[in-house]
Amino acid sequence: MVINMKILITGATSGIAYETALKLLEQNNFVYLCTHTEEEKYLLKEKLANKSNAKVYKLDVCNENDLKLLDILDYDVFWSHAGIGNGGAVLGISLDTIRKNYEVNVFKNIAVIKRAYENMRHKNIEGKIFVTSSLAAYLPLTYLGAYTSSKAALSSLCYTMNKELKLIGSNISLTLIELGAYHTGFNQVMIDNKERFLKPASTFYLYKDKVTKKQNNLFNLIEKKTLAAVSTKLSKQMSKKNPKFLIRTPLIQRLLVKLYIIFLR
C-alpha cells in the first residue's frame, strides 16, 4: 500500500474524529488514533484489527509522559480533537471545575499544538494542524459557560496562531474546526454532569432539572443525527494541499449562530 499522509488524531475514540479517521484510512493514509484511557485503547484496537494502516495509542493530553508521543511519532497532519465539557452555572460551580475546562480545552490543546508544530518544523515538512473548537463559543448557553468560554478562548488563539504562521511564511498551516451540535453523546454527558459539579448549597442547584430539560429538548431538536457529511468534509480538507483556515459546520447551525451574533448579542 502506498501511504499518502500520516495523520495523528487526539480524542479519536469515537464520534466525529473516529468516523473521519475511517474515511482517511479508506484513502490509503496512515492514521494514529489516540485515546484518553488504556481501556479505550484496547477496545479501539479490536475495532481496527483489520486495518494495517492504523495504529492506536493512549494519549491523555494531561499526561506528560503520553505527550512525548507527539515528539517521536512521524506525521505530517495533526488534529487536536480532545476536549471536555463540565457543566454547571458559572456562579454555582467551583473555580477548580472552571479551571479544569480551561486546562484541557485551552492550555493542553495549545501544549499539543506547540509540540506538533515543533515536530513538523524540525522535519521541515509542509505540515497541517487542525484544531477542534465549537460554534457554542459564540453562545451564552446556560450552565455551560465554563465549556463555551473555554472554546471561545481556543478559537481566539487559533485566529492569532494562523496570523503568526503566515507572518513568518511557515510551511505549516493551521485550520480551525468549529463544530455545531452532532449526536455523538458528548452533549448529553455535558448536559447531565452539571449535578456533579454544582454545589448543593447553591441556589443554581435548584434550577438544574429545569435547565437540563430545556437543553435536552434543544439538542434533540438541533443535533445532526448522522456523521457521514461532516466526516467526509473534514477528510477532504485534510487531504488538500492548502486546506482553508476556518471550517464551520453544519451549515444551518452556522447560519443561526451568525444571525444570533448580528441581532441578539
Region roles according to the model:
Residues T13-S14:
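Conserved glycine-rich cofactor-binding loop
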Residues L167-K244:
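SDR active-site lid
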Residues A89-V90, T97-R99:
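Substrate-binding pocket helix/loop in short-chain dehydrogenase/reductase
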Residues I113, S150-A153:
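Active-site helix of classical SDR
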Residues H81-N86:
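Conserved NAD(P)H cofactor-binding loop of Rossmann-fold oxidoreductase domains
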Residues S134:
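Residue(s) in the substrate-gating loop at a strand-loop-helix junction
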Residues Q27-L43:
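Conserved glycine-rich Rossmann-like NAD(P)H-binding loop of the short-chain dehydrogenase/reductase
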